[in-house]
Amino acid sequence: MTNIFLCAQIYQILALNDEMLKSGCITRDEHDFVRHVQTDKLTRLHSTP
């Protein structure tokens, strides 16, 4: 998979994560955990040459 595709996938996960928190499907702790993991992945992808 290309970096562009992987980044798009991460942004979709982050958007879904936010919506799940808003609708009460997940707790704030679960939301924060997913956000932390996905932003770490995004950082690694952006720092890869």
Give the positions of each predicted feature.
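Acidic, Ser/Pro/Thr-rich low-complexity regulatory regions
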Residues: 1-49
